[in-house]
Regions:
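Intrinsically disordered, low-complexity, charged terminal extensions of DNA damage-control enzymes
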Residues: 1-2, 7, 169-280
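Catalytic cores of DNA base-excision repair glycosylases
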Residues: 1-181, 187-192, 196, 210, ...
Length: 280
């Protein structure tokens, strides 16, 4: 696929594009990221401008993409690179993992894509290929270390960055979670799941904490009161309606409109309190 962060640019710009795109792709699908990446890099074209950008402008460029701590960490990373690495993106996994918001996967993705190192990052797409090729079905027993040990199956290439992305593309576009396109797959002849005609991989059951909130909607002539959020870790420093966390029992006593919002680490149940008016 043509993706905006894959277009031919200078080496330094490629490093910046890789850094920004990998932050945006954390917990977000490619098709969602594309327009945000284009807008972000148009307005913030390099590490220097990112390190100096006003926080409000930064959040405006990120607005709607979610997981706003990524934007804050991305700016912190840019500041650290400019200050400690003379504006050059570090080119070792250990150094990259010292930067805010960069963990094992992101550091490996940057090494492969930006620096052409012989590394295959283990994302969900690569995991799915390995589980199907080796017919791994005991989800709770499959560790990251075990899956990493199986990556030798893919071999190596002199174009390591392109090769790593190609493998991830096979997972995204061919070895799909449902209805995989096995007849188009370049590795189906080595795939045990294909031979068994059994492609299902059960997802882990994930149970989030449930938290309860009351959102207070103050309005006057269709003008609404918003406040800067310094209270909650989610949507930090963004404008929200005044909101309090409440006990389950109190939430259940409320009568009126409610919202259910699913986040990565919790399920939010929000009561919309429209009774409040701004008094002149």
């Amino acid at each position: 696929r043509f993706l905006p962060w894959r277009k031919k640019v200078s080496k330094k710009q490629k490093e910046y594009f890789t850094l920004v795109s990998e932050f945006m792709l954390q917990q977000t699908q490619v098709k969602t990221v594309i327009p945000y990446f284009i807008n972000f890099t148009d307005k913030i074209p390099n590490l220097i401008s990112l390190s100096k950008i006003n926080d409000n402008l930064l959040m405006r460029c990120w607005e709607g993409l979610g997981y706003y701590s990524r934007a804050r960490n991305l700016k912190k990373t840019a500041i650290k690179i400019v200050k400690d690495y003379k504006g050059k993106l570090p080119n070792t996994i250990d150094e990259l993992k010292l930067l805010p918001g960069i963990g094992d996967y992101t550091s490996r993705a940057i090494m492969a894509i930006a620096f052409n190192k012989k590394i295959i990052p283990l994302d969900g797409n690569v995991e799915r290929i390995l589980k199907r090729v080796f017919y791994l079905r005991k989800e709770n027993e499959i560790t990251k270390d075990y899956l990493n040990s199986k990556k030798n199956f893919f071999g190596v290439s002199n174009r390591s960055g392109d090769y790593a992305q190609a493998i991830m593309e096979v997972g995204a576009l061919v070895c799909k979670p449902t209805n995989p396109l096995c007849l188009q797959c370049p590795i189906s002849k080595n795939c045990i799941s294909f031979k068994k005609k059994d492609f299902e991989i059960k997802a882990k059951n994930k149970f989030n904490k449930i938290k309860y909130f009351e959102a207070k909607i103050y309005n006057s002539k269709n003008k609404y009161l918003l406040i800067k959020n310094n209270k909650f870790n989610f949507l930090k420093n963004l404008l929200i309606f005044p909101m309090d966390e409440v006990k389950k029992e109190k939430f259940q006593s409320f009568v009126g409109q409610r919202l259910n919002v699913k986040m990565s680490n919790m399920d939010m149940k929000i009561f919309i309190n429209k009774k409040n008016k701004i008094n002149k």
